[in-house]
Each structure stands twice: as C-alpha cells, then as structure tokens.
Amino acid sequence: MKSIRYGVSLIALFALYYLLPLNFRLLWQPDETRYAEISREMLATGDWVVPHFLGLRYFEKPIAGYWINSIGQWLFGHNNFGVRFGSVFAITMTALLVAWLAWRIFRDKRVAIMSPVIFLTAMLVYAIGTYAVLDPMITLWLALAMCSFWGAAQAHSRSGKILGYVLLGVACGMGVMTKGFLALAVPVVGVLPWVIARKRWREVLTYGWLAVIVCTLVVLPWGLAIAQREPDFWRYFFWVEHIQRFAEKDAQHKAPFWYYIPFLIAGSLPWLALLPGALKRGWLERDEARGALYLLGWVAMPFLFFSIAKGKLPTYILPCFAPLSILMARYALEAAKTGAKALRINGMINLGVGLLGLIAVLVVSPWGFMHRPVWTKIELYKCLLAAIAFAVWALMGWLAMKDSGRRWSLAALCPLGLALLVGFAIPDRVIDSKQPQFLVDIVSESLQPSRYVLTNNVGIAGGLAWELKRSDIIMFDKQGELKYGLDWPDAQGSFVSQAGFADWLAAHRQQGPVSLVLLMDKGESMLDLPLPKPDNAYELGRVVFLQYLPQ
C-alpha cells in the first residue's frame, strides 16, 4: 500500500511539472518557434528526409530530432503541448534510463527512485526538458549510450556483451542523426577514465567495432538519401555546424572556459548542497568495484569537453546531469542516514533562494526601486504570481531545513510554484518581443488574408509561419541564420532588402494585402522606420505590425 501511494505521488508530481504547464506557456522565439515550424512543414509536405524552415533548406541539424518533434505534433495536434511533447518524452525516457542505471550500479531501490526525481526537478533539466529544442533528444541518446556500455561491461556472457554494444551503436547512430558527430565524441570521453582505470581496453577493442558498424548502419540510409537529394548537406553540416561552431576563432556563441560553472551551480538547484559531496564521494570511491568512477567520468569528461570548445550554450551540459543525479541521490540518502549537515544546508539554500526571489520581485515591481520596472502597474497580478512561486520555494526549503533527516526530499517541490505559474507571470515587455504568438493572436484577422507576410526576425518568422500554417514568410532586411538557405537560386523570392522594399511593394501590393511584422531595436520608434506609410499599423512594445492594402 505504501509503495502504491509513493507511485501515485510520483506520477502526480510528474504531471504537475511536465504535462500540465506545457500548453499554457507561449512559445519562445527563436528556438521554439523555429523547431515548431520545421516539424509542421515536415508533416505538411511529407518530406522526412530534407529539413526545411520557411520552405528553405535548413541544414543546422540532422533529421532525427525533427522526427520526434513531428510525431508530437502529429499525435497531439497543432498546439503548444504538441510542440513541446518531443522534449518531454525524451527527458522522461532519460529519467527512466537514469533509474535503471542507478539500480544496476548500486542495487538500492531508494537510489533508483530518487535519482530520476533529482534529475527531473533539477532546474537546468526542467528548463530545457519542457522547452522545444533538440538537446533533450541528444541527452536521451547519450544516456542510452551510457547505460548500454555499462550493461555490456557488466555482462557475463558473450551475447550480453554483444547486445550492449549493439545498443551502444544504435544510441550513437541516433545521436548523430539528432545533433551530429558530438554523439560520437561524448561517449568516448565519458567512458575513458573508467576504461583506463579498469584496464578494459581489450574488451573495448574486441567489441567496439560492433558498435561502429551498427552506428554506421543506423545513419547510412538517411545519410545516403539526403546526400542524393542535397549533395551539399554533409559539407555544410560538418564544416559550418561542427568546425566553425566549436573550434574556430570565430566560433558561434564564444565564451570563456569557466562559462558552464555558473550554469552547473544554478542548474543543480534545488539540490545544490548535494553537488560538492556527490562529486567528492564519487572521487573517493573511484577504486571500488561499483560504478562511482564510471558516473563521475560521464559528468566530468563531457563537462571539460564542452568547456574546452570555443562555442558554448547552456543547453550543451544537459547530458552531464543524468549521471550527476545518481551520484547526488546516493550521497543524499547516505547523508540522511548519517545525519550529515549537507541536507540541512540544502534546505537553507532553498530558503535563501526563495527569499531572494521574493526580494527580487519586490525590487523589479512597479513599487520597487527600478527606474523602469519589469512589470507595469496593470500587471500587478503577475507580480503576485511570481511572489507566490518564490514563496513556495522558500516554504519547501524551510520545511526541509527544519527536519532535514526525514523531509530533505521536499526540495523536489521547491520549483513547483515556478513550474505552474511562470507562464502566467512573464512581463508584457518580454512577451511582446520574445513570444510572437501574443501579437499574432491580436492581429490575426488582418494577417490571415495577407497575400505576403514579411518580417525582419527569424524567430518571429517561425512563429508567424507556425501560427498561420504557411511557410512562405518572406525575410525583410535581415537574413540571420537563414542566409545559407536564402543564397540558393530557388529562394530569391524569399528575401526583400530594405532599400528595395518600396519598388517591391509597388510591384506586389496589387496581388493582395502585404503585412510586415518587425522587431525594432531598443529605443526605436515606428516613426523611425524608413518605410512607405502603411494603411494599417499596430505597435506592441518593440514589435510593430504594418499592412499595405491594394490600391
């Protein structure tokens, strides 16, 4: 009966975190609107080989992540839940793999249960796991690689080892098809410390070729198909999306070596106090037969790998949290048994985070000290919701601190207020520029019949295309990440320069209404735009809607 009650509680907690809020949060640009539209176009065209965005060639990533996202929209429809379902599905499967690996390594049911709980409630995991990007998918395949290699290494029969390496090849192959050759590098560096320490080179060399063959067989059908359809794909994807992004001096998203440390710290909330002890214990137990060193290798080596790379984004270290959550769960359970101070400190940290959040809400509110508050006076209910969210965090932290020996796991409830309320507390000024669904809904009656729709922002373009269910959105003045696709001869009609807009408008407005949705620079006004006078205009923060009717 007790186990049933715990099971129901965990399912309810998962639903509150990962299912209920999805449809009530507007899509963010540029990432969510981009991936929503790519998958919508895949379903609309039936082309499951070549990724397209706004009808243009879009070779930033391979195809498998788009497949998962497309299945989400196919199953649940054209809504925000369907867009985000792929990420939730991937992160949920990762959590189940975390539970499996925790059980296989430590043979402790409590560790196997708490590991996915810690994983799913860690802030970085939750933020990315409910956000429509491809990182949860690559995390799933890397977690499968981590589990399959361990299963193969611990198997006592030849067939068990073969099965493990076959699964490793499948995981690496799907990883390559999701986010590229990164899926080959991370497993290699992840297992390296354990293989060296345990002197398992002979076994790896004996069976490793099997994983390589299976990986190749997984990638080959689609790899050949897209090479036949789009011969330039592999050149662009390998050189631009791998070499230039990660290694060259002008790499995208350049950041210093220590860039990920703050994200590791903040992303570990509400379990931050467990982080030092978990890593330390993993190191101290490196010589034991259990897999502490194996888990530590999968945390530290990918973290160092991404830190060395010149191009960095917070989402890249998401795979590190799968093994880290197992180390943290084991350390927490041992701390509860021995009465260690770490659990009480964890409660104190969460109490402090909640109180600091409440103070921050007060400071940036209309009655705070900022010259330009985050929320305006008509958004007081949003201030209240934000305050409630942080109050929940503080309350759970306080309860966990008061009885850390028995209630330390209440830390899992700390982010629940944010999870349920953050979508309703986003300031209007942020919604206006970062969540284009809001504007599209306001001007939809004018947008729907438009013959041409133009925008100067790729993220807004994705939002317009997805909301209007049309891929013929035209880029105006700026090309951004669509430059490669726009450079092709068959895409010349998909871009209009600002200098040539007046002539283009004169030639096209008689075919039907022409609508522009433009993101202005900070401090810029609609009156500053060097454009012909529109017939209709609507300004919402930094976003302006202009419409030209036939004359």
UniProtKB/Swiss-Prot annotation:
Q: Note the topology in the membrane.
A: Multi-pass membrane protein
For the protein in the UniProt heading, the enzyme class is transferase
User: Which Pfam families does the UniProt entry name for this protein?
Assistant: PMT
EC number(s) reported in the record:
2.4.2.43
Is this entry keyworded Nucleotidyltransferase? no
Q: Which GO terms describe its cellular component?
A: plasma membrane
Q: Which segments cross the bilayer?
A: 8-28, 85-105, 111-131, 176-196, 207-227, 255-275, 291-311, 313-333, 349-369, 380-400, 408-428
Q: Which GO terms describe its biological process?
A: lipid A biosynthetic process; lipopolysaccharide biosynthetic process; protein O-linked glycosylation; response to iron(III) ion
Q: Where is the signal peptide?
A: none
Q: Which reaction does it catalyse?
A: 4-amino-4-deoxy-alpha-L-arabinopyranosyl di-trans,octa-cis-undecaprenyl phosphate + lipid IVA = lipid IIA + di-trans,octa-cis-undecaprenyl phosphate
Give the pathway annotation: Lipopolysaccharide metabolism; 4-amino-4-deoxy-beta-L-arabinose-lipid A biosynthesis
Spell out the NCBIfam families in the cross-references: PRK13279.1
The protein's matches in HAMAP family, at most eight in alphabetical order, are given as:
ArnT_transfer
Tell me the function of this protein: Catalyzes the transfer of the L-Ara4N moiety of the glycolipid undecaprenyl phosphate-alpha-L-Ara4N to lipid A. The modified arabinose is attached to lipid A and is required for resistance to polymyxin and cationic antimicrobial peptides.
Which family does the record assign? Belongs to the glycosyltransferase 83 family.
What this protein is called in its record is Undecaprenyl phosphate-alpha-4-amino-4-deoxy-L-arabinose arabinosyl transferase
Organism equals Klebsiella pneumoniae subsp. pneumoniae (strain ATCC 700721 / MGH 78578)
Q: Which gene encodes it?
A: arnT
